[in-house]
Amino acid sequence: MKESIKLKLESLSDRYDELAALLGVAEVIMDQDLFRAYSKEYAELEPVVKCFNEFQQIDENIAEAELMMTDADPDIKEMGVEEYKAGLAQKEELQLVLQKLLLPKDPNDSRNVFLEVRAGTGGDEASIFSGDLFRMYSRYAETQRWKVEIVSASDGEHGGYKEVIARIVGEGAYSKLKFESGAHRVQRVPATESQGRIHTSACTVAVMPEMDEVDDIIINKSDLRIDTFRASGAGGQHVNKTDSAIRLTHIPTGVVVECQEERSQHKNRAKAMSLLASRLQAAELEKAASEQSETRKSLVGSGDRSERIRTYNYPQGRVTDHRINLTLYKLDEIVAGELDSLINPLVNEFQAEQLAALSGDN
């Protein structure tokens, strides 16, 4: 292990012990904000420190095995060789785990997300496919025990959506879904196709971390144009009685958001403000990523919504993620919400990129 990494781990271990002591101090316990901040930091450090302690114990075991290897008794010597080999293998494995734990954390990973799915090329079939994608993400959210709230939706003429925007609430939602942004392509025979020909359609997906307008991004009220209108769609007689739907226009950037799913204008406005903050933040992040990509192109994490990232081929039952050349012949399971078989390899690839960069920096 590099000396710089070892010193970093020792420093984190000292901080962990310090926090353990602080969390027992009466003044800290009385200060809820401070107690919460220390508790969060302590919880984040715990897996790193535990792994480092295990790593140090293995180092001690290896040293003991080396002593056994010098023993005159051949049985003890043989046992020492076996323990030495096992210790080295464990040490190498733990070293990789520790390096991953030390990778810079995305501050947005624990946030809720706004998910946008839009029909692209392909007409009605693209709208139907956008409905399939939204259902896929909704089912995946169920498996993660996340909550899905539709913010706005524009139905397709023959099913699905021209556009659907949803808020997904749950721990780690962004960390799991952030690599889904991009163009998703489908190849299949549409239900409306009488000749049995395979058509290609596409949808774009955008995943944005939910921003707290107050804490994360400042929006001047003077920069907003606020319009109210009557909600369309489900809702019974209520939709014809009040202008509960909200449209916000951010004048400096031209970004427009709508929310009409809640019956209360106040709730629609709050959701629209949150979505607007996330859109503005996403635009800033996209700009920064674009500038950064001129020096170093990230294979997985670019998040460019125009980039073709995945193809769903129904006749072959195949899903291909083009960023990491991963092909899985389990389309039915994936569109039913079993996304981890795609998400986990993407996360692993992204971490491998980070590790390579970390090695280069050191």
Swiss-Prot record:
Methylated by PrmC. Methylation increases the termination efficiency of RF1. InterPro entries: PCRF (IPR005139), Pep_chain_release_fac_I (IPR000352), Pep_chain_release_fac_I_sf (IPR045853), Prokaryotic/Mito_RF (IPR050057), RF-1 (IPR004373). It is found in: Cytoplasm. Keywords: Cytoplasm, Methylation, Protein biosynthesis. The modification N5-methylglutamine is found at residue 237. It holds the Pfam family RF-1. One of its GO terms (cellular component) is cytoplasm. One of its GO terms (molecular function) is translation release factor activity, codon specific. HAMAP family: Rel_fac_1. Belongs to the prokaryotic/mitochondrial release factor family. Peptide chain release factor 1 directs the termination of translation in response to the peptide chain termination codons UAG and UAA. This is Peptide chain release factor 1. The lineage of its organism: Bacteria, Pseudomonadati, Pseudomonadota, Gammaproteobacteria, Oceanospirillales. The gene is prfA.
